[in-house]
């Protein structure tokens, strides 16, 4: 029975992949198409699990992740990388996973179960946590969304005071998810309180005995893409980031494509710092936008640390920014941004003599970035909740994904808006560590530690929103 089901799912997935390939460069179409056929991809790896094929199931689940992003990166790197899983030609699992970092935690949600694969070198372990209180994946997803809301409430993200750099919905982070979450939830699991510990117990505790490295690499799915892993709390009230560096990747394949590209593909020197572009006279969607004085302070402070002159105000023209993207190793942007589409507002190329400028004169789109040949090792997006976006079967579709697809080796983003002074303090610590040739992952971890140890910014809301997505990189900023 399972063999017949496996054959059917294999054939379906192969057909869906062929159809998706025919969509060529239509990224939005691919994302929508992938979501419509989630059942086939899930059915494939679940069928493999029923036959006890743990590693093959992991590879099949991986093949379904971030497919449209992989296509963007294929175009960027020209790698024509093979998927980890080929339904008609199963390669050696050891060969497929030999370059996966340890400890890598691949997560999947199916039915009322959270599946956790832990990759240690060529060894793959599986732990599954079933929520017997629920009968469907929809109910479990509702729980995860509710835990996300509760975590934000307990962290206190609503109390953050900062200048608004977001071009998205003005509602709170919680309200956006509330719309998708039923209100008639009375089960004890939905209660508020100790949410960060409950998330630890659900995701980390089941695999704790399998973790054997300082760095944890998470490959999340669904609502788990938005949770603050570094702030998870163990039974001894210690944060996960106190024991481990934490990094996130969209899929195993996308990371492999980055690490397999030629050594000289990404730039080794140069930095572009952009803050508070002048938007005087600009009407975006009929609205004028305020100046971002703290964004300006932010890049000016970073410029002093690195010895680099930032582009601020009128100097931060779209044309100037695009002209520099291809030649720098570091890009830091503190400006108005739209998380779902990856658009960022720059100073217009034209003057106001002929009236308000057209959007194309100041709106930096991902199409623009792709054409500009971005080759940065690290992109830091200081645009409010830049880690967020629409959660789909493809993954989180937002500004961070856009920059990875455009060629960034790694992207640092934030899950929620941070206070203005806290942002300055964090960036001071982060870039201080980067300038000492610490890797981005270690610099992030050390900056979090410094914030926790400070008297003014030790609350979780001030240090836990940051997420490093992609590869870990070291920048020799003295070359800049």
Q: What are these model-derived regions, one by one?
A:
Residues 58-67:
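Catalytic cores of secreted or luminal carbohydrate-active enzymes
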